[in-house]
C-alpha cells in the first residue's frame, strides 16, 4: 500500500494492552484515511450513545495518506471522537508537525480506549510503543509538558500532542495542543483525552512515507505548489498577514460579529487586523510541515515574549465579540488559551454569552463577588476568566460547561450563539446565507471550515456568488464544499489549499501518491460517504433534525441592524428542505437505506 501504511496503534488504557492492527487497501479506497478511517472505526466499534467522558468513548488520532509527504500542506491530522460539548461527532483538525511524525513512525492512526488508573502519556518511537507515568506533569501547562517529555525521552525531534489543565479538568471545550501552539481545538477533544487520564502522546519516527510513483508525484507537487504561490490569497494575503487578513475584509462586508453577534460592523476592526499585527508585533512567519503558504505568525509581547498566533478566529473571539479592541490583550489571551489548552472560539463565545447575560441583568454582581463584572470591552474579564475556566474555579466552573449550558441555566438559551451547542465562529450568517445553511447542517455543529461558503459568497472562490442568493445552485455548492472538505481532511491536507487548488488537483496528488486511477467523481464520492457516515453517527447518537439543524433565533428573527446586510435575516426555512432533498435524504432529514446502499455503507443502517 502507498500513502497509507495500512497500520494503526490500538491502546487500551484500562488494561494497558497495546496492539498494532492492519487494514487493507480496499478499506482505504472506501474511506481514504484520517477523518474517513476514524468515522468508519467509530461506527463499526462504538455505540454512538455512550457518555463522551466515559471510558467507552474512543479517541482516534489519525493522519491521512498525504500526511508526511511533500504534498503542499501535508502535515494535517484529525482527532475524532464523540464530543462532550455537543453529544455528537467532532473531528478536530490540526497542523504543525505531529501528524507527519506519526506517519514517519510507520502508523496512520492511534485508537485510544478505556481510562488509565493514574495520569499517563504514550511514547512511540518507530516499533517501540509504551505507556509511561505522567503524574509529575499532570497540572502543567502545555509548554512545560512538552519540555519535560523532551528531556525524559532525550530527544528534541520528538513531536508531542498534549492537554493543559483545561483538559485535565474536563472543560467541555478543552483542546489538544501539539507543537506548542497548534490546536485540535473544537468540540472538547481535550476533555475526552483528560477523561482517560491521558496527558500526552509523544512520537518520533525514522521512516519515509511510501509513494507509488515518486518522480510523477514530485512533478505534480511542484505544479500544485506553484499554483498556490501564484494565488493572491494562498500566495499573497495569507503569508503576508496571516489569517487575520480577513478581519478588514469580513468587517467591510458587514458580517464581522460584534458583542455576541448583536451586529456585524466593528468600528475598531483595523486595530486588531492582520495588517496592524504585522506592523506592531510580528517577528516572523512559521509554516506547518510541507506548507508553501506559511500563514502562522510568531509575535512578541513584553508580557509573554515570543508567542504564536492569534489566528483570525481567535482575534475575533477574544476581541470584537467581547467588545475588546486592544490587540496586545488579545494576543496575550490567545497565548493563555494555548498554554491552558482551550479552544479560543468557544472560550470567546462563552464569555460573550456571559457578557450579554450580564448586560440584560440575568447574571447579577452578587454572583460574581470580587470577580470582575462581565462588561463589554473589559480586558480584565478576558484574562481573569480564561484562568478560572481552565481550573474550573468560581464562576469559571459554570463557564467551563460552554455557552449553551450557561445561557440555559439562566433560562435564556437563545443568547447562546451555538449550533448543536458548539459556539459559532467569526462570520455572521445574516451576511452569508449559504454559510448559515452550512452552520445548521454541519455534522459537528457551529463550524465554518467543514463548509466554508465564505469562499464563494465573500472571497469569490471558485467564483463569486451573491451572499443572499438561496437558490439550488447555492445549496449544491455547499454540498460540494462539505464533501470536498471531508476528502481534504481525510487526505491529510489543509483547507487553505482550496485557495488555488480545485477537486482535480487533489485527484492528481492522490493518484500519483497512492497509485490509483480514481476520477475526481470517485474522490468526491469518498467525501460524500464520509459526510453521510458522520450524519448517521449523529442520528444514532440522538440527533433530531427538527431541533438540531437550525440556527440561533437571532439570525432567523432579528434583522442585521446596520451595514451592507442591514435588514437581512437567514432564510433557513427556504433552504433546509431543498438541502435534504439534494442530499438524497428524507423530508425530515434522515438518511434512507437506499442512500446508504448507494454509498456502500448500509451495514451501519
From Swiss-Prot:
Coiled coil regions in record: none
UniProt-annotated binding residues for [4Fe-4S] cluster: 288, 291, 295, 494
Keywords attached to this entry: 4Fe-4S, Iron, Iron-sulfur, Metal-binding, Oxidoreductase, Tungsten
Cofactor note: Binds 1 [4Fe-4S] cluster per subunit. Binds 1 tungstopterin cofactor per subunit.
pH dependence: Optimum pH is above 10.
SMART domains, alphabetized: AFOR_N
Binding site for tungstopterin: 76, 93, 95, 182-183, 185-186, 338, 342-343, 444, 450, 489, 493, 495
Catalyzed reaction equations: an aldehyde + 2 oxidized [2Fe-2S]-[ferredoxin] + H2O = a carboxylate + 2 reduced [2Fe-2S]-[ferredoxin] + 3 H(+)
MF (Gene Ontology): 4 iron, 4 sulfur cluster binding; aldehyde ferredoxin oxidoreductase activity; electron transfer activity; metal ion binding
EC number: 1.2.7.5
InterPro entries recorded: Ald_Fedxn_OxRdtase_dom2 (IPR013984), Ald_Fedxn_OxRdtase_dom3 (IPR013985), Ald_Fedxn_OxRdtase_N (IPR013983), Ald_Fedxn_OxRdtase_N_sf (IPR036503), OxRdtase_Ald_Fedxn_C (IPR001203), Tungsten_al_ferr_oxy-like_C (IPR036021), W-dependent_AOR (IPR051919)
Membrane recorded as keyword: no
Thermal behavior of activity: Optimum temperature is above 90 degrees Celsius.
Cofactor(s) in the UniProt record: [4Fe-4S] cluster; tungstopterin
Pfam family, one: AFOR_C
Activity regulation, short description: Inhibited by arsenite, iodoacetate and cyanide.
Family: Belongs to the AOR/FOR family.
Subunit structure as annotated in this protein's UniProt entry: Monomer. Homodimer.
Function: Aldehyde ferredoxin oxidoreductase with a broad substrate specificity. Catalyzes the oxidation of a range of aliphatic aldehydes to their corresponding carboxylic acids. In vitro can use crotonaldehyde, acetaldehyde, formaldehyde, butyraldehyde or glyceraldehyde as substrate, using methyl viologen or ferredoxin, but not NAD(P), as the electron acceptor. Does not oxidize glucose or glyceraldehyde 3-phosphate. May be involved in a pyroglycolytic pathway.
Note: Shows an active (AOR) and an inactive (RTP) form.
Protein name: Tungsten-containing aldehyde ferredoxin oxidoreductase
Source species: Pyrococcus furiosus (strain ATCC 43587 / DSM 3638 / JCM 8422 / Vc1)
Amino acid at each position: 500500500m502507498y500513502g497509507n501504511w495500512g497500520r494503526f496503534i490500538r491502546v487500551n488504557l484500562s488494561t494497558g494492552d497495546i496492539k498494532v492492527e492492519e487494514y487493507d487497501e480496499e478499506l482505504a479506497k472506501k474511506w481514504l484515511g484520517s477523518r474517513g478511517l476514524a468515522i468508519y472505526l467509530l461506527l463499526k466499534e462504538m455505540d454512538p450513545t455512550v457518555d463522551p467522558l466515559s471510558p467507552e468513548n474512543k479517541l482516534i488520532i489519525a493522519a491521512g495518506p498525504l500526511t508526511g509527504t511533500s504534498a503542499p500542506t501535508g502535515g494535517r491530522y484529525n482527532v475524532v471522537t464523540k464530543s462532550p460539548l455537543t453529544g455528537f461527532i467532532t473531528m478536530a483538525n490540526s497542523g504543525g508537525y505531529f501528524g507527519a511524525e506519526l506517519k514517519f513512525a510507520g502508523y496512520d492512526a492511534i485508537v485510544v480506549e478505556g481510562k488509565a488508573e493514574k495520569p499517563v502519556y504514550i511514547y512511540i518511537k518507530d516499533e517501540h510503543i509504551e505507556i509511561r507515568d505522567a503524574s509529575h506533569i499532570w497540572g502543567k501547562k502545555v509548554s512545560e509538558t512538552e519540555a519535560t517529555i523532551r528531556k525524559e525521552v532525550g530527544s528534541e525531534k520528538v513531536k508531542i500532542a498534549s492537554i493543559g489543565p483545561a483538559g485535565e479538568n474536563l472543560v467541555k471545550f478543552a483542546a489538544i495542543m501539539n507543537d506548542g501552539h497548534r490546536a485540535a481545538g473544537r468540540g472538547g477533544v481535550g476533555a475526552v483525552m483528560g477523561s482517560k487520564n491521558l496527558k500526552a502522546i509523544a512520537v518520533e519516527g525514522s521512516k519515509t512515507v511510501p509513494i507509488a510513483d515518486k518522480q510523477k508525484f514530485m512533478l505534480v507537487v511542484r505544479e500544485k505548489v506553484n499554483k498556490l504561490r501564484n494565488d493572491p490569497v494562498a500566495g499573497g494575503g495569507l503569508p503576508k498577514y496571516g489569517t487575520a487578513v480577513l478581519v478588514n475584509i469580513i468587517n467591510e462586508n458587514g458580517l464581522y460579529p460584534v458583542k455576541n453577534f448583536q451586529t456585524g460592523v466593528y468600528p475598531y476592526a483595523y486595530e486588531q487586523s492582520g495588517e496592524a499585527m504585522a506592523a506592531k508585533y510580528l517577528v516572523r512567519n512559521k509554516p506547518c510541515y510541507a506548507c508553501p503558504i506559511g500563514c502562522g505568525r510568531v509575535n512578541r509581547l513584553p508580557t509573554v515574549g515570543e508567542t504564536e498566533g492569534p489566528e483570525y478566529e481567535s482575534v475575533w473571539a477574544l476581541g470584537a465579540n467581547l467588545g475588546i479592541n486592544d490587540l496586545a490583550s488579545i494576543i496575550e489571551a490567545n497565548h493563555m488559551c494555548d498554554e491552558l489548552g482551550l479552544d479560543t472560539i468557544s472560550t470567546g463565545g462563552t464569555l460573550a454569552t456571559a457578557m450579554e447575560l450580564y448586560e440584560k441583568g440575568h447574571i447579577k454582581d452578587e454572583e460574581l463577588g470580587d470577580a470582575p463584572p462581565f462588561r463589554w470591552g473589559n480586558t480584565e474579564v478576558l484574562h481573569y476568566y480564561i484562568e478560572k475556566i481552565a481550573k474550573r474555579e468560581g464562576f469559571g466552573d459554570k463557564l467551563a460547561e460552554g455557552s449553551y449550558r450557561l445561557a440555559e441555566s439562566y433560562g435564556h438559551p437563545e443568547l447562546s450563539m451555538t449550533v448543536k451547542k458548539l459556539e459559532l465562529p467569526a462570520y455572521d450568517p445574516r451576511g452569508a446565507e449559504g454559510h448559515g445553511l452550512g452552520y445548521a447542517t454541519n455534522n459537528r455543529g457551529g463550524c465554518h471550515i467543514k463548509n466554508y461558503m465564505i469562499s464563494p459568497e465573500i472571497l469569490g472562490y471558485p467564483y463569486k456568488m451573491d451572499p443572499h442568493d438561496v437558490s439550488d445552485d447555492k445549496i449544491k455548492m455547499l454540498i460540494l464544499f462539505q464533501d470536498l472538505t471531508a476528502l481534504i481532511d481525510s487526505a491529510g491536507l489543509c483547507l487553505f489549499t482550496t485557495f488555488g487548488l480545485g477537486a482535480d488537483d487533489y485527484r492528481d496528488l492522490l493518484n500519483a501518491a497512492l497509485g490509483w486511477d480514481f476520477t475526481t467523481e470517485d474522490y468526491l464520492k469518498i467525501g460524500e460517504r464520509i459526510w453521510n457516515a458522520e450524519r448517521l453517527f449523529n442520528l444514532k447518537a440522538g440527533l433530531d433534525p427538527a431541533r438540531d439543524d437550525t440556527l440561533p433565533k437571532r439570525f432567523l428573527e432579528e434583522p442585521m441592524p446596520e451595514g451592507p446586510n442591514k435588514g437581512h435575516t437567514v432564510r433557513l426555512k427556504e433552504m433546509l428542505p431543498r438541502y435534504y432533498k439534494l442530499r438524497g435524504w428524507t423530508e425530515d432529514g434522515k438518511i434512507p437505506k437506499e442512500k446508504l446502499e448507494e454509498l456502500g455503507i448500509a451495514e451501519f443502517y
